[in-house]
């Protein structure tokens, strides 16, 4: 059974790139377009890993991560922040919110696949 990855990303083009990359690598991909839907989908679908954009509508990625990690049934799911915030200290904010990993956009497909596989093995 392939591992399920939830991509929480509001930009359609970024979702498509991640979906294509992960699907071609043999993963099942679920998608949410905002933090609120992402939290709900994480609870319903129980993915093996979450790729979380930080700048999201309705509920941002920091708050969505905090909500997921506050749920005892979900807190074990690794969350990797994928963000266009490449400023100093943003990785620390992502980790403080509960993220387990961090990528700045634009990202290398090879590097992101290696990190995803690292968390899923």
Tell what function each PLM region has.
Residues 26-33, 41:
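Short hydrophobic/Thr-rich beta-strand motif most characteristic of the beta2 strand and flanking loop
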Residues 107-116:
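C-terminal output helix
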Residues 9:
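Conserved acidic carboxylate
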Residues 57, 75, 87, 105-106:
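The feature encodes the CheY-like receiver
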Residues 45-51, 56:
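Active-site beta3 strand of CheY-like receiver
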Residues 16-24:
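Charged docking surfaces used in two-component/phosphorelay signaling
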């Amino acid at each position: 059974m392939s591992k399920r990855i939830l991509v929480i990303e509001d930009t359609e083009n970024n979702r498509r790139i991640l979906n294509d990359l992960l699907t071609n690598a043999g993963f099942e991909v679920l998608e949410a377009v905002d933090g609120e839907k992402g939290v709900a989908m994480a609870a319903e679908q129980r993915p093996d890993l979450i790729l979380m954009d930080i700048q999201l509508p309705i509920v941002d990625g920091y708050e969505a991560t905090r909500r997921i990690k506050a749920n005892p049934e979900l807190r074990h799911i690794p969350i990797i922040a994928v963000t266009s915030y490449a400023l100093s200290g943003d990785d620390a904010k992502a980790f403080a919110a509960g993220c387990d990993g961090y990528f700045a956009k634009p990202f290398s497909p090879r590097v992101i696949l290696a990190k995803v596989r690292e968390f899923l093995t």
